[in-house]
C-alpha cells in the first residue's frame, strides 16, 4: 500500500496542482456519464470501476497537493458519524430523504 501512496504523490508532484485539477474535472465528467448510464439502464457499465478509480486517484492527489489530508480525514469521520446518527434516529424506517 505504501508504494501506491508513494506513486500517487510522485505523479502529483510531477504534474502539479493546476494540471491535476483540470484532469480531475475531466475525470469527474467521465464518471458522471457512467453513473448516468447506470441509472438509466439499472446496470453497472464496464467502465464504471475504471472511472471511479481515476477519480479516487486524482482526488487523493489533490488532497495531497492542497496539503489538507488531516482536514479531509476529520470531515470524513464527522460526516460518516453524522449520517449514522441520522439513520439511528430513524430506527428501522428505510425511508430516504
Regions found by a protein language model. Name each.
Residues 1-97:
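Flexible "arm" and connector segments at domain edges
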